[in-house]
Amino acid sequence: MKIKINDYTKGEVIKIIREWTGLTQQDFGKSIGKSKPSIQAYELDKINYGIETLLKIAKKHNLTITIEKNK
């Protein structure tokens, strides 16, 4: 599956990835060293996460992050 993250909020991106994994917020959080409240806050766009967190998620859940220049 593939998404264009420019079409989503940061929170929606985290939620989509978590749903792909089939994990609860608590289990997803544990998988990346974050708490359930942190994952909830990410998904609701209440707190920001950095590229380090996104890279950690990608590595842990076998995802590829691609940046492509628009034509």
Residue map of PLM features:
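DNA major-groove recognition helix of helix-turn-helix/homeodomain DNA-binding modules
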Residues: G50-I67
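Residue-level recognition of specific faces of alpha-helices
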Residues: V13, S38-A41, T53
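N-terminal flexible/basic segments that precede or flank functional cores
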Residues: M1-Y8, N62-T64
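Short basic helix-loop element that most often maps to the first helix and adjoining turn
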Residues: E12-D27, S31, K56
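Recognition helix of helix-turn-helix/homeodomain-like DNA-binding domains
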Residues: G33-I47
